[in-house]
């Protein structure tokens, strides 16, 4: 039986404590989960550019390969956390050593991942069992998208720490390596723009999104780890994809749910993370905040994208943010002409609209994943010895509001009870 378990949620969340550039002087801590969020936002932009020349089935296939390839790489990275990239690349050059390391990693991943979905697990095994020559000599389009996105997000981080590490003998070589490898990928549409700097609307969007790693959630509540908005969005996206697999959604719905989770807090780049009690303090405040967010997103992201020749990307982001339905947490489908139609609820979407041609997107499922990620933040901090009344209140509120909720074959309360 397919099931989403506590151990997998915690495993994904553990990237919030995994420091990056740990051997360099850093202006602030940089965490793996934030880098993964930035990487996947960049990968989305590159993916949508490739979709311009693909049919629907090819788009869905490529989208699944991009998302799952990113998750498979992230899982591997979490297991080999202490191996620096140069050392890992040396290991990968020796096929026998790489196979032994991969066999060990798969053994660590199996009890966490396999219960979620057997086919997903088999795809993970196949992904990490590919010959090294295939990865380096004949990469797929998805591989190239993910590699370029990884390089861009890592180079972005390095740009933060470079001025502080003028004494570091490795700094020049690291910078040269990033630029050289990105330059070698310029045949992939979108990469030349990433190399060109912030004058392009595509790069400006990726750059703005990267700044969400500086915005700490629960900013007035001490926590360990102190998750940022960027990492939170990646965690919500990952949970949404897991739930989509567990529910047996169509490919379009699974992809839409991942990307909706990935972008659901994008407007907070422009208005900051406003905590739930404040939002609920005045009856009209949520509407005021929502309108401010929509206006700012239109001015700083959507309008530049449209004017820069990326109206198709703007339209997808509008759909994920639920701007035509009033909220990202509403179930929607899209007609052949692109018209967005709101669906009455989860059951209606799940029973009657689970088809690629309808381009379905969940609402309540995304909200549940958002709440589960917040629950993980509060629960993990308390477990790590940092507690406060606000964290206990958040856990109690989530249990009270979602403890009896059932989405298809997924019982939210049963999963929450595993954390007792």
Language-model features, listed with the residues they occupy:
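Alpha-helical, largely C-terminal catalytic domains
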Residues: 1-420
């Amino acid at each position: 039986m397919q099931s989403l378990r506590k151990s997998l949620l915690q495993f994904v969340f553990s990237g919030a404590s995994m420091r990056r550039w740990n051997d360099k002087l850093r202006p602030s801590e940089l965490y793996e989960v934030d880098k993964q969020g930035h990487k996947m936002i960049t990968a989305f932009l590159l993916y949508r550019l490739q979709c311009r020349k693909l049919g629907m089935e090819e788009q869905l296939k490529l989208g699944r390969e991009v998302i799952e390839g990113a998750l498979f790489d992230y899982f591997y990275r979490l297991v080999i956390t202490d191996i620096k990239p140069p050392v890992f690349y040396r290991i990968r050059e020796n096929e026998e050593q790489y196979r032994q390391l991969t066999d060990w990693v798969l053994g660590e991943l199996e009890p966490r991942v396999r219960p979620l979905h057997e086919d997903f697990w088999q795809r993970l095994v196949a992904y990490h069992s590919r010959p090294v020559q295939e990865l380096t000599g004949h990469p797929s389009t998805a591989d190239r998208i993910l590699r370029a996105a990884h390089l861009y997000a890592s180079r972005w981080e390095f740009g933060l720490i470079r001025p502080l590490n003028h004494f570091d003998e490795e700094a020049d070589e690291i910078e040269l390596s990033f630029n050289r490898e990105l330059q070698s990928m310029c045949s992939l549409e979108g990469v030349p723009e990433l190399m060109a700097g912030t004058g392009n609307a595509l790069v400006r969007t990726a750059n703005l999104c990267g700044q969400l790693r500086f915005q700490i959630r629960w900013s007035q509540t001490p926590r360990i780890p102190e998750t940022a908005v960027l990492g939170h969005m990646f965690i919500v996206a990952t949970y949404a994809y897991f739930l989509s697999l567990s529910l047996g959604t169509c490919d379009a719905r699974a992809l839409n749910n991942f990307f909706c989770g990935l972008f659901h807090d994008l407007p907070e780049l422009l208005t900051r993370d406003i905590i739930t009690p404040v939002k609920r303090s005045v009856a009209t405040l949520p509407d005021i905040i929502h309108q401010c967010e929509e206006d700012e997103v239109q001015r700083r992201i959507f309008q530049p994208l449209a004017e820069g020749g990326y109206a198709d990307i703007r339209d997808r982001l509008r759909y994920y943010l639920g701007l035509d339905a009033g909220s990202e947490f509403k179930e929607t489908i899209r007609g052949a002409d692109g018209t967005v139609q709101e669906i009455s609820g989860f059951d209606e979407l799940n029973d009657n609209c689970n088809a690629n041609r309808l381009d379905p997107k969940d609402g309540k499922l995304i909200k549940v994943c958002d709440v589960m990620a917040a629950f993980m933040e509060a629960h993990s901090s308390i477990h790590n010895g940092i507690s406060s009344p606000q964290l206990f209140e958040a856990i109690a509120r989530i249990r009270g509001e979602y403890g009896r909720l059932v989405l298809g074959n997924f019982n939210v309360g049963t999963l929450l009870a595993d954390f007792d």
